[in-house]
Structures are given as C-alpha cells and as structure tokens.
Swiss-Prot record:
SUPFAM superfamilies the UniProt entry points to: Ribosomal protein S6
Protein name: Small ribosomal subunit protein bS6
InterPro entries reported for this sequence: Ribosomal_bS6, Ribosomal_bS6_sf, Ribosomal_S6_plastid/chlpt, Transl_elong_EF1B/ribsomal_bS6
Chain's role: Binds together with bS18 to 16S ribosomal RNA.
Gene: rpsF
Database matches in NCBIfam families: S6 (TIGR00166)
Length: 95
C-alpha cells in the first residue's frame, strides 16, 4: 500500500457542515479495500485562483490516504462524476 494525498475542491453552494458526511461514502471505499484514511482536513471556503465552472470560490478538503493505486483511481473517478466536485488532484507521497 502507498501513501496518497488528495485535494478536493467542492462547490461553495454546499453547506460546509455537510462536507464531511458527503465524503464518507467515498472514504468507505478506502476502508472496504483494507486501506486507511490517515487525515481529513477541511480548509473551508477559499477563493480560487481562476474560475472553475463559473465559480470564484470553493470548499477545499485535503485527504491523506493509505491504500492501493486502484482504490485511489476508483475514488477519483467517482468524485469526477459528482456534480458538486469542482476539481480533484491526487499526489503520491514520498516514503
């Protein structure tokens, strides 16, 4: 298993209190595949450098995951299907 850092930018129209519960269904995929969620860091609403889908702000979330690469690819695919997700970025952490 490898360490990954995933940054997610969520549509600012979503209430910040509902961000963690809405991400739980994606994090459950990691847990079911014998991975672990090391940290969930919700930065809150921030201004974007450039507009994404005509939005100037987004809710930033940073996840630290320990899982297989196929699991990360599946989560990224599912997040990109979701209309509330503006952008995702996955980085493999150095050991």
């Amino acid at each position: 298993m490898r360490q990954y850092e995933m940054m997610i930018i969520i549509d600012p129209s979503q209430d910040e209190r509902t961000v963690a519960p809405s991400l739980d269904k994606y994090l459950d995929i990691v847990r079911k595949e014998n991975g672990s969620v090391e940290k969930v860091d919700i930065w809150g609403k921030r201004r974007l450098e450039y507009p994404i889908n005509k939005k100037d702000e987004g809710i930033y979330v940073v996840l630290d995951l320990k899982c297989e690469s196929a699991t990360v690819l599946e989560i990224d695919r599912l997040l990109n299907i979701n209309d509330q997700i503006l952008r995702t970025k996955v980085l493999r952490k150095d050991q």
